[in-house]
Amino acid sequence: MNTKYIFSVFQLSLLFVFSSCCDKNSCQNEKKSSKLTQQSIIDAASSDTSAVRQSLVRINSTIQIWSASQPWDKSAPKKRRALGALLEGNRVLTTAEMAADATYIELENADNTRIIPAKVVAIDYEANLALLEPDNGDTDSFFKDLKPLRLGSSAKIGDRVDVWQLEDNGMPIVTDAVIQSVDIVSSFANGHFFLTYEAKGSMQSASNSFTVPVIRNGKLLGLLSSYDSKDQIIDIIAPEIIQAFIADTSDGDYVGFPSLGIGISSTVDPNFRDWLKLSDDLGGLYVTKIRKDSAAQKAGLEKGDVIININDKAIGRRGYYTDQQYGRLYWSHLIRGSLKQGDTLELTILRGGEQKQIMATLTRPEEPLVARDTYDQAPVYLIKGGLIFQELTATYLKAFGKDWQAKAPLNLLDIMMTPEDYEKDRNKIVFLSAVIPTPATTGYERLRNFIINKVNGQTIADISTLIDAFKKPGTDGLHTIEFAE
């Protein structure tokens, strides 16, 4: 500390000696130059600060998730905070993670002086995107002096981007990052993969942890979906996905990203390739499943077909193709990243050793037998005589914990893995989830996770048919419940 002080005094003394040696004009010029340089830095800093503060909106959400074991109840409320990107029309773009299962959402300006309640305009759990807008309140006052961001174009590997953050006190933080790779990533709803930039940058810890905007050349490039502080890797939802999402909301009726509706496996194994009659110059994906009423089924695709081309893009043995801009990408981007519902694509397949062309019109998948994403939806259940009946969902199975695929009941897991074996005469799977201890249920307390086939002789397709069946007891007034084997 003393050394630093002495050195500072020595510097000041030296500066005084040199300054006394210059003439009046040169001293004035140096002072003027110094003043201009300092003013330029201040102006630039003010400009950057203004851009961040004027285009970012704080988002505060209260989240409550429905209980799987007690479907009439909710978990304790949790708070989430994030930064959203202000768009044209006083709308705010954020991730679905900030809006899913939210009981209350509010918008707050950068300096914490104005707050307004918000509502969800559109949400896509699969792509992890949500669009918010004010819900009553003084809209004009809230958005006064704020400037919307324009959507930017796609980037390439090596491009530099800025990650915008705000401290609690409103001070902006701008982190420089470099795009290192592009991949297809699932960021929120499991099993749904979308185009994602992976950038390298050391982000500072700030109050907004769930998502922040990423900027390139003054325009919105994407939204942060995750950050690995150890490896300093930032996952960014790509602009193509955001643009498709925004375009779909323009008519007020959000549809969502299309699906082909198939299950696939790779064709790497040489013995498997010989059996499929695949030559060495062909890649290909083996079709293992065709979803009921899907675009693939309507187009005539069959289980056992091998997809070797999609819209003239050769599909490799592991499912990758060469994208003109990004290089090697997984085949799903050809469906969910560059096309919309109603678009037609051409599939070149190998069936029995012969190549065929199939045209498929993309659609949204129908509600599956076992619903995978039940965000913002209360569990469908019925309590009758102390017996709790539910419709099976992936949410229920995941409630068994981190290792749910090993801990959940095997009979219910089998339904999720092979729903086609259970679809006959069913819209949903109804099962007995638990028994409430009462005098009437004595001896039945351990009954749980049994699939319901019939009640009072009526086949059970969903909860609504279960309710109808219980209205028709036997002549003795008793109800008969038949479980699946």
Question: Which role does the model predict for each range below?
Answer:
Residues 18-20:
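C-terminal motif of bacterial Sec signal peptides marking the signal peptidase cleavage site
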Residues 27-86, 92-98, 104, 128, ...:
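N-terminal activation segment of mature serine protease catalytic domains
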Residues 98-101, 298, 309-348, 454-484:
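PDZ domains, with a preference for the canonical peptide-binding region formed by the helix
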Residues 36, 40-49, 220-279, 320, ...:
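C-terminal cap/linker of serine protease catalytic domains
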Residues 122, 141-196, 205, 226-235, ...:
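Flexible, gly/ser-rich surface segments that form the specificity/activation loops bordering the active-site cleft
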Residues 75, 203-213, 265-309, 313-316, ...:
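PDZ/PDZ-like domain segments forming the peptide/carboxylate-binding groove
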Residues 55-60, 135-148, 173-236, 280-288, ...:
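Active-site region of chymotrypsin-like
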Residues 88-173, 203-204, 357:
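Conserved active-site neighborhood of the chymotrypsin/trypsin-like protease fold
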